[in-house]
Regions:
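C-terminal catalytic "cap/lid" subdomain
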Residues: 1-202
Length: 202
């Protein structure tokens, strides 16, 4: 957990490459992805230390089969630089190629998406708002209106993502409730919950 947000967080003694990658997605910025690729490919353990406190043991990053224990939760990371575009159109779930048309527009504008939850009549596209500069947001909006013709289109600003990561989440009954309940108790509404197929992150 970011010590700037939580006082005296527990140190992470050990994590897997996969856990590190999941945490880095939501702001756990320690390594550049390409910089550690040779270590991952060679299954070489990495030790991360605090330059201000080099006497501390630091965090070991190891292959999954070398981890000495699997924490229920290894780390929590967050990022707040997201926006979402919400589209509503009757029976979009039956329209072949609907999502592909939107992705083509985004590709033309060199915009990638983070998540795309959908329903029977609606679709939400969550984007890194750092991509929506230099008029791209306006161009994306106009092209979707012209080419997709949604019944409703809305921008929803200031989304945050909280990433909870741990190898111990795999197949653990009640993991989702343990994470969601404190958020509910804090009076925070959830827009979307997503657990990847690897099950190590929520």
């Amino acid at each position: 957990v970011n010590p700037g947000l939580v006082a005296d967080p527990a140190p992470i003694k050990e994590m897997t490459y996969n856990e590190m990658r999941e945490l880095s997605y939501a702001g756990f910025a320690v390594f550049h992805d390409e910089a550690i690729l040779p270590a991952i490919q060679g299954k070489i353990p990495i030790c991360v230390k605090n330059t201000n406190r080099p006497e501390m043991p630091g965090t070991k990053i190891v292959p999954r089969d070398k981890v000495s224990h699997k924490n229920k939760i290894t780390g929590i990371a967050s990022s707040h630089h997201f926006q979402a575009i919400y589209l509503h159109r009757y029976l979009i779930n039956r329209e072949v190629g609907f999502t592909a048309k939107i992705l083509k527009i985004m590709a033309d504008l060199n915009i990638s998406y983070e998540h795309m939850p959908s329903g029977i009549d609606d679709l939400t596209i969550i984007l890194d708002k750092n991509q929506l500069t230099n008029g791209r947001k306006e161009k994306l909006t106009q092209r979707i209106k012209d080419e997709i013709q949604p019944d409703d289109l809305q921008w929803r600003n200031d989304y945050a993502i909280i990433m909870v990561v741990g190898e111990g989440l795999v197949n653990r009954v009640g993991a989702m409730a343990d994470i969601v309940d404190p958020i509910r108790d804090a009076g925070i509404s959830l827009t979307m919950v997503n657990q990847g197929s690897s099950e190590i992150s929520i």
